[in-house]
């Protein structure tokens, strides 16, 4: 029996929600280990759609413990709102079903304000953030001045920590011409929200270690995609945390040996939200068609996603940097009806053929995709639950992807419904 880490293998929005829900039904514990409420995921269960952004997917499954790990930055006000919103759909979240790492960093109003100011102040330098304060909160964490969940329980220490935090932020705000933050007001806001957060606080690394030693199945749920990883992504057009599978250990407090099977979620084509390089982007009618069919709009922001052909070179990179054992291929049905389909196998840079995306921002902007064209299929793949139901050309497309990325398909998703899934290998049985 293996614990399972789920990571997006592209730029996010790969369809992790459905796959995580499918796995969560078999898990005892589901853990979020990085990011914040900047990346949404959609679950469709018994015809009911749940949209989550901070809460782990396990919250909609009875009998599953959900955990927000220390690698996550937590907006306490958003968390309270999300718990209430999910509650209106009949999902009861209590301290018995949700635990939050007491050493997790908090996102504060000043982080959201700074994020918004930076992103709108200079259009030529914008990264394409969600303006939700994620980056500035991580900056404070690394700068050792962050307010953490545990600090909400100590009013005296909280005041001292706010004073230290504002020594930095108010100096910065003066330089930017932004009104300074009043420490007393911020403290009052935090003390008001504290009773709604502290009941969920726990020493999560101990809880998870006990679960592991007790033989419980742990599912580590990644947010976004590995190509947005702060080290291994298309820097600087990335998020502010590590997303690759190794972060599951760091962001939860468990050792690397606790990570078992790494499942990469891969869309049958490529999408990206916001700024940054996108070698296979389609700005023509084909790109529009893929976007319309796939309903490619962000769960959190509603922003339209950029669409393009499948980039095997990029996914191959992620397979290596995350140690992916197998993939879940999603949205194959969106490609139904295309006469021909292209797959990017590598790039041309200044006349040279290369098999990976270079780290240089300038080089990333100049690479030209090298395509392989295969015949499409006109039969539907939507709702297929076995290989026998798939058109021969669709199977050929899947097999070619496996060859190019160096990883096999463990699951194949053919619609948003959880049961429309072809199981090749159950990651928990590795």
Swiss-Prot record:
PROSITE patterns, A to Z: ADENYLOSUCCIN_SYN_1, ADENYLOSUCCIN_SYN_2
Co-factor binding details: Binds 1 Mg(2+) ion per subunit.
Spans through the membrane: none
Residues binding substrate, per UniProt: 299-305
Names of the cofactor(s): Mg(2+)
InterPro entries xrefs: Adenylosuccin_syn_GTP-bd, Adenylosuccin_syn_Lys_AS, Adenylosuccinate_synth_dom1, Adenylosuccinate_synth_dom2, Adenylosuccinate_synth_dom3, Adenylosuccinate_synthetase, P-loop_NTPase
GO cellular component terms attached to this protein's record: cytoplasm
Binding, Mg(2+): 13, 40
Residues given in the record as IMP binding sites: 13-16, 38-41, 130, 144, 224, 239, 303
Sites where the protein binds GTP: 12-18, 40-42, 305, 331-333, 413-415
UniProt-annotated catalytic positions: 13 (proton acceptor), 41 (proton donor)
Pathway: Purine metabolism; AMP biosynthesis via de novo pathway; AMP from IMP: step 1/2
Source organism, top-level taxon: Bacteria
Keywords: Cytoplasm, GTP-binding, Ligase, Magnesium, Metal-binding, Nucleotide-binding, Purine biosynthesis
Subunit structure: Homodimer.
Described purpose of this protein according to its UniProt entry: Plays an important role in the de novo pathway of purine nucleotide biosynthesis. Catalyzes the first committed step in the biosynthesis of AMP from IMP.
Family: Belongs to the adenylosuccinate synthetase family.
Protein name in UniProt: Adenylosuccinate synthetase
